[in-house]
Amino acid sequence: MTINALLLSSSRVGDTPYLAHAIPFIKPLTTQAQKWIFIPYAGVSMSYDNYLASVVMGLAELNLDISGIHQHPDPCQAIKDADGILIGGGNTFHLLHELYRYNLINLIREKVAQGTPYVGWSAGANVSGASIKTTNDMPIIEPPSFDALKIVPFQLNPHYSNYRTPGHNGETRAQRLLEFTKVEPLTPVIAIAEGSALWRRDNTLVLLGKNPAYLFCGEQQEMLIPIGSDLSHLLK
């Protein structure tokens, strides 16, 4: 079996409907997977039922059977029974906290390694990396560890933009990621702009979408990654 994981920067790009831009990216992962489990734990400011309803509506044209993990009495069994795994955006710290709380980290990692398709956007992409140390989110709750699913062996930074508001004196995103690379100079960070995604298929990794990504690693800072780039070397 081969890993088949799609890591989306965001649920929207511009003013497009929820998950609409992601449909062409997600569709290839659904050809042999109809029964999907959605993990809404990153959704702190909405009910899990409402979050699930938004995802079901957003992906309606794919005709998938999507249930929320919160609807199942045994979250671990729900993961075991699923053909595919969806993890949505929101607060990455809360998401990871709940994954640890329900003992899902190793189980999801093993399922994905065995070939179960994985789709994560925003926080759901963050937790697919080595750790959540490069998330943009507020640490509203403390998970037992920052270590994440390790579906890819590097760091991710979704929603990437290095825009600086005129007159604003806070650090840019690039400056924040530089801080990480000073502490962990050997760990790559891929910063993904909205509208783009990383697709891992076994030992291959490619950048999809309409906007470039950026690599931060050691002395390499904000190195442009064009759309369509083969990034398979980062999996080694």
From Swiss-Prot:
Cysteine pairs bridged by disulfides in the record: none
One annotated GO biological process: proteolysis
EC number(s) from the headed UniProt entry: 3.4.13.21
Enzymatic class: hydrolase
UniProt entry keywords in alphabetical sequence: Cytoplasm, Dipeptidase, Hydrolase, Protease, Serine protease
A GO term for molecular function: dipeptidase activity
Protein location: Cytoplasm
Protein name, UniProt field: Peptidase E
Family per record: Belongs to the peptidase S51 family.
Catalytic activity of the protein: Dipeptidase E catalyzes the hydrolysis of dipeptides Asp-|-Xaa. It does not act on peptides with N-terminal Glu, Asn or Gln, nor does it cleave isoaspartyl peptides
Role this protein plays: Hydrolyzes dipeptides containing N-terminal aspartate residues. May play a role in allowing the cell to use peptide aspartate to spare carbon otherwise required for the synthesis of the aspartate family of amino acids.
GO annotation, cellular component aspect: cytoplasm
Keyword field contains Lyase: no
Annotated InterPro entries: Class_I_gatase-like, Peptidase_S51, Peptidase_S51_dipeptidase-E
Catalytic center residues: S122, D137, H159
Main localization (coarse): cytoplasm
